[in-house]
Amino acid sequence: MRAVIQRAKEAKVTVGGEVVGAIDAGFVVLLGITHEDTEDDAAYLAEKIAHLRVFEDEDGKMNRSLLDVGGAVLSVSQFTLYGDCRKGRRPNFMAAAKPDHALPLYEAFNAALRERGVHVETGVFGAMMDVSLTNDGPVTLIIDSSEKPGNR
């Protein structure tokens, strides 16, 4: 499971001209899911994201977490995070999980964040979405659950 995390001052996701999710300060999380991912991967990423200390404290140091600042997450499923661009000019998406495997894990990830006290707004799984945000910093991080200690 792969997450691209962007610290945002505000963000929203629109489907068919209608806003379906919006947050004030927090993270926009673009989440990609691959075939081998499990609920353990979802829980691992949720725990990491909820506690990442990338918000500034009173001294201007990145020392506060999403929970510390009362931030929210705008969670957007994005299979293209598993696009393989090594050959040719058209990405290969064979590493991206099919919807029947990915949707329950996307929902498990969002539920795991909520269990940790994070307010979560979402896009629409599988839909064409317009995501807009005001980057804060910018601060952008990539976390891949396959790189956690003891994994695969």
Swiss-Prot record:
Catalytic activities: glycyl-tRNA(Ala) + H2O = tRNA(Ala) + glycine + H(+); a D-aminoacyl-tRNA + H2O = a tRNA + a D-alpha-amino acid + H(+)
The protein's name in its UniProt record: D-aminoacyl-tRNA deacylase
GO MF terms held by the record: D-tyrosyl-tRNA(Tyr) deacylase activity; Gly-tRNA(Ala) deacylase activity; Ser(Gly)-tRNA(Ala) hydrolase activity; tRNA binding
Species: Thermus aquaticus
Cellular localisation: Cytoplasm
Subunit record text: Homodimer.
Function: An aminoacyl-tRNA editing enzyme that deacylates mischarged D-aminoacyl-tRNAs. Also deacylates mischarged glycyl-tRNA(Ala), protecting cells against glycine mischarging by AlaRS. Acts via tRNA-based rather than protein-based catalysis; rejects L-amino acids rather than detecting D-amino acids in the active site. By recycling D-aminoacyl-tRNA to D-amino acids and free tRNA molecules, this enzyme counteracts the toxicity associated with the formation of D-aminoacyl-tRNA entities in vivo and helps enforce protein L-homochirality.
Gene3D superfamilies: D-tyrosyl-tRNA(Tyr) deacylase (3.50.80.10)
This protein's record includes keyword Hydrolase: yes
